[in-house]
């Protein structure tokens, strides 16, 4: 029997839906919602569904709960896939299925022909356990070797963040973990909208929003709304939440720029620049000096003559005690805005710090050779 590829396959409402709430470095990133192809690979789908709920108790082979909760994504390869499911050893050497240690390849009806496909990891033919991977690009070389049994229907943005975490070899440098998981029944809230009391009514990732990303004017309205929410958090000195909202704006902007014509996408540059600058300001308030420098560099890549970016980067350099770098940025800012009093005052302060540093070094040398 032939079946359409997942690329062309519409979502089947009778198939099970499950979710992962993902944490990276102890911080919640978001939710991935997956459809399991129980209509085509029922045994494989049921294995994964039960591992999401934890309803099968303790595994006889591993002696560990048959449950993905607390399980890491232990292997990440950019432009390929993210892998997890080893709930026992947590490093790719363990895990087991709900049917026993291993079970057979059910079928290979579906091809690995798009991002966001859920497929069984294995150690050869008929060695399926609990380990799985989610593709981040088409991977046709895996066809006929790994069983495709589901797809991401919400939260591909979360999967992309996982794909891009820093790795040492193929191991994430930060712990990437399934903090919560389970099954979503008909009528359940899929949990893709924020519940932070801020009035934010937009999904955290633009891929999950019911909006045409090519509609730049609509994205601009959403971005301004989110920026205003971020500004409210900034005014209340909730720097972390402000950064989250400004970063969310940048996700929507980048999503729209990728989809829209270049001329239309240029309309989004001012709101993007404003949010990057605001992130830099938040990081200064948090004494995250390197983070502030990095954010201001990003702003200067958008607008090389932006005096706010130069001024704030100079403050970041001072926090890092890189006074010569700060001086260079402030001199450039003064060339652009010679009448700006704040730049003049900061320039004087940096010159005084450089003098104090040199005086201290002279005193130390004098003492050394006295």
Swiss-Prot record:
Top-level EC class as recorded in UniProt: isomerase
Disulfide bonds listed in the record: none
Tissue: Detected in heart, thymis and brain.
Residues modified to N6-acetyllysine: 171
Region of interest called Chaperone activity, as start-end residue ranges on this chain: 185-215
Domain PPIase cyclophilin-type: from-to ranges: 19-183
Record field: catalytic activity: [protein]-peptidylproline (omega=180) = [protein]-peptidylproline (omega=0)
EC number, UniProt record: 5.2.1.8
Cellular localization per UniProt: Cytoplasm; Nucleus, Nucleolus; Nucleus, Nucleoplasm
Regulation: Less sensitive to inhibition by cyclosporin A than is CYP-18.
SUPFAM superfamilies: Cyclophilin-like, TPR-like
Span of the signal peptide: none
Region of interest: Interaction with HSP90AB1: 214-370
List of residues that carry Phosphoserine: 5, 198
Pfam families, per database record: Pro_isomerase
Modification note: The N-terminus is blocked.
TPR repeat boundaries on the chain: 223-256, 273-306, 307-340
UniProt-listed GO biological process terms: apoptotic process; cellular response to UV-A; chaperone-mediated protein folding; lipid droplet organization; negative regulation of transcription by RNA polymerase II; positive regulation of apoptotic process; positive regulation of protein secretion; positive regulation of viral genome replication
Family: Belongs to the cyclophilin-type PPIase family. PPIase D subfamily.
Protein function: PPIase that catalyzes the cis-trans isomerization of proline imidic peptide bonds in oligopeptides and may therefore assist protein folding. Proposed to act as a co-chaperone in HSP90 complexes such as in unligated steroid receptors heterocomplexes. Different co-chaperones seem to compete for association with HSP90 thus establishing distinct HSP90-co-chaperone-receptor complexes with the potential to exert tissue-specific receptor activity control. May have a preference for estrogen receptor complexes and is not found in glucocorticoid receptor complexes.
Subunit structure comment from the entry: Identified in ESR1 or NR3C1/GCR steroid receptor-chaperone complexes. Found in HSP90 chaperone complexes with kinase clients LCK or EIF2AK1. Two monomers associate with one HSP90 homodimer. Interacts with HSP90AA1. Interacts with HSP90AB1; PPID and FKBP4 compete for binding to HSP90AB1 and the interaction is mutually exclusive with the PPID:HSPA8 interaction. Interacts with HSPA8; PPID and STIP1 but not FKBP4 compete for binding to HSPA8 and the interaction is mutually exclusive with the PPID:HSP90AB1 interaction.
UniProt name for this protein: Peptidyl-prolyl cis-trans isomerase D
Organism of provenance: Bos taurus (Bovine)
């Amino acid at each position: 029997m032939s079946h359409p590829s997942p690329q062309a396959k519409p979502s089947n409402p009778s198939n099970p839906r499950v979710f992962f709430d993902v944490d990276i470095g102890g911080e919640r990133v978001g939710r991935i919602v997956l459809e399991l192809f129980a209509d085509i690979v029922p045994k494989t789908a049921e294995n994964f569904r039960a591992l999401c709920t934890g309803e099968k108790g303790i595994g006889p082979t591993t002696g560990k709960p048959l449950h993905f909760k607390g399980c890491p994504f232990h292997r990440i390869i950019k432009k390929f896939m993210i892998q997890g499911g080893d709930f026992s050893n947590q490093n790719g050497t363990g895990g087991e299925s709900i049917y026993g240690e291993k079970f057979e390849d059910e079928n290979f009806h579906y091809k690995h022909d798009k991002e966001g496909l859920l497929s069984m990891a294995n150690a050869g033919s008929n060695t399926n356990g609990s380990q799985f991977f989610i593709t981040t690009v088409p991977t046709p070389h895996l066809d006929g070797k790994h069983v495709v049994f589901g797809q991401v229907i919400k939260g591909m943005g979360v999967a992309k963040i996982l794909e891009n975490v820093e790795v040492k070899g193929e191991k994430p440098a930060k712990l990437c973990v399934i903090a919560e998981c389970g099954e979503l029944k008909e009528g359940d809230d899929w949990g893709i909208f924020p519940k932070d009391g801020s009035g934010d009514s937009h999904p955290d990732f633009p891929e999950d929003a019911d909006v045409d990303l090519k509609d730049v004017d609509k994205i601009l309205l959403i971005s301004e709304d989110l920026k205003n929410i971020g500004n409210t958090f900034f005014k209340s000195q909730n720097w972390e939440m402000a950064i989250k909202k400004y970063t969310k704006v940048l996700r929507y902007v980048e999503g729209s720029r990728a989809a829209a014509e270049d001329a239309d996408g240029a309309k989004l540059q001012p709101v993007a620049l404003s949010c990057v600058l605001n992130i830099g300001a938040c990081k200064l308030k948090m004494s995250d000096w390197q983070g502030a420098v990095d954010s201001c560099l990003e702003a200067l890549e958008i607008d090389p003559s932006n005096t706010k970016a130069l001024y704030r980067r100079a403050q970041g350099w001072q926090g890092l005690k890189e006074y010569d770098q700060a001086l260079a940025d402030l001199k450039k800012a003064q060339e652009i805005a010679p009448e700006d009093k704040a730049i003049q005052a900061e320039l004087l302060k940096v010159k005084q710090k450089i003098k104090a540093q040199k005086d201290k070094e002279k005193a130390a040398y004098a003492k050394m050779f006295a």
